[in-house]
Amino acid sequence: RFVFQSEVLFTTGSADLGGEGKTQIIQLAGTLKEIIKKIPPKIEWILRVDGHTDRVPIQTSRFPSNWELSTARAISVVKFLVGQGISPTNLAATGFGEFQPIDPRDDEIANLRNRRIELKLTQR
């Protein structure tokens, strides 16, 4: 499992990968390629890219809710991984909005922890 805080990858309220975010995902793609080489061919696997937000409401024309923002961020990461040579047949993007927090508190530290992208390599 890989976890990236959203602030490393995106600016606030955006689903566009920033420069640092692209650098991080390029490094991740390199690591993934090494891991993928070791997976036996008959094992069907998938890398799930999960977008998560904090509980602060967002309501813009592009992102009417945190579900849209979290999903758009996951899709951005998936598309970038495809551009780095990871097969799209082994990728899935999901958005959880604010509904799967890792920190249930209602403060800025919790918000920071809850804004994240999680990547999980699992058997299909």
Residue ranges and their predicted role:
Residues 1, 44-45:
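Short edge beta-strands and adjacent turn/loop segments
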Residues 1-9:
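Extended, gly/pro-poor, charged amphipathic helical "stalk/hinge" elements that serve as dimerization
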